[in-house]
From Swiss-Prot:
The name this protein goes by in its record: ATP synthase subunit alpha, chloroplastic
NCBIfam families for this protein: atpA, PRK13343.1
UniProt keyword ATP-binding present: yes
Keyword Transport on entry: yes
Length: 507
């Protein structure tokens, strides 16, 4: 028979009393009522904040978006397949935030700032809220520095400034992403940090973009945020804000940043899916009523900081896909009204071999020549006017049989100007090279050449100028002005190269 020893029992009780922890832990918890399609309805969570992160029993994180009288609508940041009805959920007391640091440069991450490139963890000592307020009026200044894209058509006629928001819009397969990636490639050596946000893209397309950046050495100053088409809607909705938070981190450290959203219409579709599942009332095209606010609060974060804040900048280039050229659809009109201009890419131009397929007639930059160096303003002024007159004449010439000599000359000049705007993908040009190209075209030096010879001649001219007249580039880069000395050097180079070229073509 077991004997009970009172002293042993009292020792155990005494030990337990001594080890008793008096701390009272208050946890705001709730119970899962219903789960499915990336949405969970929770009973309880009485003091939860709008946008607060909540944690499910099995580890999935969600965001409380709908706060109703008897339940809370939560969107899941994962598939949530292990969440069960009746399981508990606890509020974390935190709003969605991500770690930020210099170590993110050169990495591919997801919307939660977790690396997805298989190169290990990223160290970060600081964090930023995913949804930060946009800079106020006093903390901004007007845009005055150019952000060179390396594309003649854009830098000469639709210039983009640091701190501007310029929409790239067009049908599918018209080279929208190519314009954006060329802009990133052109920032090499310009001290600009680039963030490329891929929302709902094919994983193969994102991999292709990353490979291009790696091959051209652009990943050194670029961060890629990717949520592909198979990602949960919540993460596709969050990805642009994550990219903006990373770009802001550098902007507030007095650096220049450029962020590309590819594309916000996919983010709007993900948000529509979440809203409809949360039973929010649908509006036009079944989008929720606050879809404008979805994009405006994102794009308003792009700014040129005032001198008090160090003059950092964040330039936003959202890309929106249209359906058969319809720019009057809901999302395109919303984004057009928020941005400071748009670059319109045309499928007809693309198919007729004009690439980049920029429709200069309906593309605008509301910042204009404030975002150009003086040298570019001096040579590019005539270009847009001559191209506009050419487009008008070309339409008229289709119906007229006999044209006078002046009209024929103007048409010939226009065709050569259109030819000089053509560029290969991933071959951005420096400002100096663009000035050479535009000056040669607008001053009639190409008129004597066949259209097929224009591209070849310009390539050779740029090479000749670089090797034989290096002082031309020095004058433009140091003074930012197209001086008389620079013009004389350029005229000399054109004449010398033209003689060489014509001899070469004859042989």
């Amino acid at each position: 028979m077991v004997t009970l020893r009172a002293d042993e029992i009292s020792n155990i009780i005494r030990e337990r009393i001594e080890q008793y922890n008096r701390e009272v832990k208050v946890v705001n918890t709730g119970t899962v009522l219903q789960v499915g399609d990336g949405i969970a309805r929770i009973h309880g969570l009485d003091e939860v904040m709008a946008g607060e992160l909540v944690e499910f029993e099995e580890g999935t994180i969600g965001i409380a978006l709908n706060l109703e009288s008897n339940n809370v609508g939560v969107v899941l940041m994962g598939d949530g397949l292990m969440i069960q009805e009746g399981s508990s959920v606890k509020a974390t007391g935190r709003i969605a935030q991500i770690p930020v640091s210099e170590a993110y440069l050169g990495r591919v991450i997801n919307a939660l700032a977790k690396p997805i490139d298989g190169r290990g963890e990223i160290s970060a000592s600081e964090s930023r809220l995913i949804e930060s307020p946009a800079p106020g009026i006093i903390s901004r200044r007007s845009v005055y520095e150019p952000l060179q894209t390396g594309l003649i058509a854009i830098d000469s006629m639709i210039p983009i400034g640091r701190g501007q928001r310029e929409l790239i819009i067009g049908d599918r397969q018209t080279g929208k992403t190519a314009v954006a990636t060329d802009t990133i490639l052109n920032q090499k050596g310009q001290n600009v940090i680039c963030v490329y946000v891929a929302i709902g893209q094919k994983a193969s397309s994102v991999a292709q973009v990353v490979t291009t950046f790696q091959e051209r050495g652009a990943m050194e100053y670029t961060i890629v945020v990717a949520e592909t088409a198979d990602s949960p809607a919540t993460l596709q909705y969050l990805a642009p804000y994550t990219g903006a938070a990373l770009a802001e981190y550098f902007m507030y450290r007095e650096r220049h940043t450029s962020i590309i959203y590819d594309d916000p219409s996919k983010q709007a579709q993900a948000y529509r899916q979440m809203s409809l599942l949360l039973r929010r009332p649908p509006g036009r095209e079944a989008y929720p009523g606050d879809v404008f606010y979805l994009h405006s609060r994102l794009l308003e974060r792009a700014a040129k900081s005032s001198s008090l804040l160090g003059e950092g900048s964040m330039t936003a280039l959202p890309i929106v896909e249209t359906q058969s050229g319809d720019v009057s659809a809901y999302i395109p009109t919303n984004v057009i009204s928020i941005t400071d201009g748009q670059i319109f890419l045309s499928a007809d131009l693309f198919n007729s071999g004009i690439r980049p397929a920029i429709n200069v007639g309906i593309s605008v930059s509301r910042v204009g020549s404030a975002a150009q160096i003086k040298a570019m303003k001096q040579v590019a002024g005539k270009l847009k006017l001559e191209l506009a007159q050419f487009a008008e004449l070309e339409a008229f010439a289709q119906f007229a049989s006999d044209l006078d000599k002046a009209t024929q000359n103007q048409l010939a000049r226009g065709q050569r100007l259109r030819e000089l705007l053509k560029q290969s993908q991933s071959a951005p040009l420096t400002v100096e090279e663009q000035i050479v190209t535009i000056y040669t075209g607008t001053n009639g030096y190409l008129d004597s050449l066949e259209i097929g010879q224009v591209k070849k001649f310009l390539v050779q001219l740029r090479t000749y100028l670089k090797t034989n007249k290096p002082q031309f580039q020095e004058i433009i880069s140091s003074s930012k002005t197209f001086t008389e000395e620079a013009e004389a050097l350029l005229k000399e180079a054109i004449q010398e190269q033209m003689e060489r070229f014509l001899l070469q073509e004859q042989t």
